[in-house]
Regions:
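Acidic/His-rich structured neighborhood in mature extracellular/periplasmic domains
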Residues: 21-22
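Structural signal for the C-terminal ends of transmembrane alpha-helices
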Residues: 3-10
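Generic low-polarity alpha-helical segments
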Residues: 1-3, 138
Length: 159
């Protein structure tokens, strides 16, 4: 999605998108891992932790972000993510790593994670901007950072 932003067709700027994806990934990891280790479903190939499919959840998370960002400006791009995510889900079934219910639940968790991120991010971002008496949100930039040694937050404030 970030590469497509260069064409200027996105709904939100890249900083907002980065924050939305990071929040959605956090929701997704928390939900899928909690369920995966609580349920303990055995995989079709005998391995542990089948339900839900984390690969499918991540694939549909990406597809749903693309849909939310590009559905109004570039529908082909918006819907193509779902085709790729469906391919990932089918590959998990084909490779005998998941049951059908696993990939359906994974798709649901991925989409739900994005919806939760979009519901929570903007009110929080706007409240922070109002709290520090800013008229717009372009003076404050907060973005997650990742490295092999850990993660953190990047904070930039124009004054």
């Amino acid at each position: 999605a970030f590469v497509c932003d260069l064409m200027g067709k996105e709904k939100h700027n890249w900083v907002d998108q980065l924050c939305l994806v990071a929040i959605a990934e956090g929701f997704n990891a928390a939900m899928t891992r909690t369920v995966k280790y609580t349920v303990g479903e055995i995989r079709p190939d005998g391995g542990p932790h089948s339900f839900p499919s984390g690969h499918t959840a991540n694939a549909f998370l990406g597809a749903h972000v693309a849909w939310k960002e590009f559905k109004d400006s570039c529908p082909v791009l918006a819907y193509s993510g779902y085709a790729l995510a469906t391919f990932v889900a089918c590959s998990r079934l084909y490779n005998n790593r998941h049951w059908v219910a696993d990939v359906i639940a994974g798709a649901g968790f991925g989409i739900l994670s994005v919806e939760l991120a979009y519901l929570t991010y903007f009110p929080i971002r706007n409240a922070i901007a109002r709290k520090i008496n800013m008229k717009g949100n372009d003076r404050l930039v907060v973005a997650p950072t990742f490295s092999p040694d850990g993660g953190g937050l990047y904070l930039s404030w124009k004054f």
